[in-house]
């Protein structure tokens, strides 16, 4: 499973990072804002799991289900 957290280290970003770590989910952290803009992201955090992009709410739901 490929998990990428797109983050600017904002408070919501840190919540997702903490939850991923608490569930022992391995993830890569991406802080490249140019890439985020190129992907069409208007907010952070965003979570990508096996190519599926999730916003904060969807990412929380996914993490909680793991």
What are the residue ranges of the model-derived segments?
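Non-catalytic, surface beta->alpha helical segment in thiol-disulfide oxidoreductase systems
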Residues: 48-66
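Short, flexible helix/strand-to-coil boundary loops that buttress conserved ligand/catalytic motifs
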Residues: 17, 40, 66
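Local sequence-structure signature of Cys/Sec-based thiol-disulfide redox active-site neighborhoods
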Residues: 1-27
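A short acidic, often aromatic-flanked loop/helix-cap motif at beta-alpha or helix-coil junctions
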Residues: 33-37, 61-63
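Structural micro-motif
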Residues: 39-47
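A short beta-strand-loop structural module common to alpha/beta enzyme folds
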Residues: 26-34
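Short secondary-structure boundary/hinge segments and terminal tails
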Residues: 37-38, 54
